[in-house]
């Protein structure tokens, strides 16, 4: 798969994840945010909770369990730490979530997956 095709697939997965989150009461407040230490695919808010979300797409649902690793989560957490002042208010709960997507499957939302 070319870099452009992978990028397009990632964007489609992020749109699908954002749609799913909106259906479940979340408001998308940021997308595809890059900082020197990492990247966050989506930032969502529901009430006093702000979630920094890594989105992963795999062609086979069986591969989803291997889609996320500690290295990737550390980078998302580092990016979230830099971005938190921009999206979170005092006393908000901040967490790192993962959305796993595959063809013909409902998205799987894993909440609070990273604790430093």
UniProtKB/Swiss-Prot annotation:
GO terms for molecular function: nucleic acid binding. InterPro entries: Restrct_endonuc-II-like, tRNA_endonuc-like_dom_sf, UPF0102_YraN-like. PANTHER family: UPF0102 PROTEIN YRAN (PTHR34039:SF1). Belongs to the UPF0102 family. HAMAP family: UPF0102. This is UPF0102 protein Sala_0262.
